[in-house]
């Protein structure tokens, strides 16, 4: 059944049917009752997306992220969803791992979102949507868009200071793929690592490997580090998931953590506490919630003014770090 058929049966215009079924004013009670009866007689169910579009708002927010299956992203999504649900908004998730697949998804949905949350992706992805689509970035600071982030460089320096103070000098970095955006979270963390190692006079480019922010990538990267003539005594992983993969490979290689190799992660996922992982804690759910609040505020105001929020991190020292054996002896 269509809205036109309901209008014909009730003897009113399509616009009147739309207003009556959406509960809007300027519809006589008798007319509203007639429209509702006609809709029931025809078993008509209005399309919620069409109704939303007719009002000028879809009540849908898009969230774009490179790895939608990561625990880090899941925490951000959870925080954002909680805020959005209370305001009656749905959340639609895009993956940006492939520019082609993102463009295809965005092309199908660009008219169906009121705003975008961009997690660890550059503001250029906003061009896939309508020019006036509101957007907020998470993890990547932008002058043009509102953002929520942590001080990734400082957090990385803090983690490195811990390892250096323990006496480690052969410290490897399980990084992510090179980014085109110098202000992206992985790039800022990498820069913090490089600065700490250079200041300590022990930077070695062969100790920086790409773990791809995945379990498989981190495992392969760890094996390549262990194959070096002078392997590292400590690993700093830019995510807890990569740190967990590294620990698994170390144990497979009969190396003890932290007695033989120390490991530091980044995020402080729930699993990190269970495994006793030393890691940088960042408030992932808070970042997601804050991004949703900023975005909804921008949508309501419609002024396009950007706002930036910075959240604190702290190093949680547990049981995967210790002084290297050379220092202990």
Where in this protein do the model-derived segments appear?
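Short amphipathic alpha-helical segment that frequently serves as the phosphate-/nucleotide-binding helix
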Residues: 32, 77-78, 190
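Short beta-strand segments enriched in small/hydrophobic residues
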Residues: 16, 54-67, 162, 170-179
